[in-house]
């Protein structure tokens, strides 16, 4: 019966982040769709999808920080990956969206 307890713990842990993961996946799919469809046609919707993606990453990161230390030496691999994804997403969205807005 120990494996059932392990699965329940895993399910409970996943449920904490479920809403954030749904927003993250939905906005990532919207970003990919808008990139393939053409950003120039829908720049404001694309920026909205990027903003949702980044805000859900931030929410996921801060939910993760409640259980993990903030100091750099004590940060886990998953925390470092979340930080890297957030930074890459922010830089990519700025570089992608900049040419489409009038100066």
Swiss-Prot record:
A Pfam family this chain is assigned to: COX4_pro
Topology with respect to the bilayer: Multi-pass membrane protein
Subcellular location: Cell membrane
Source organism, top-level taxon: Archaea
One Gene Ontology term of the molecular function aspect: oxidoreductase activity
Enzyme Commission identifier(s): 1.9.3.-
Any single Gene Ontology cellular-component annotation: plasma membrane
Record field: transmembrane: 20-40, 42-62, 75-95
UniProtKB keywords: Cell membrane, Electron transport, Membrane, Oxidoreductase, Respiratory chain, Transmembrane, Transmembrane helix, Transport
InterPro entries per UniProt: Cyt_c_oxidase_su4_prok
Presence of keyword Coiled coil: no
Protein name: Heme-copper oxidase subunit 4
Species name: Aeropyrum pernix (strain ATCC 700893 / DSM 11879 / JCM 9820 / NBRC 100138 / K1)
Taxonomic placement: Archaea, Thermoproteota, Thermoprotei, Desulfurococcales, Desulfurococcaceae
Name of the encoding gene: aoxC
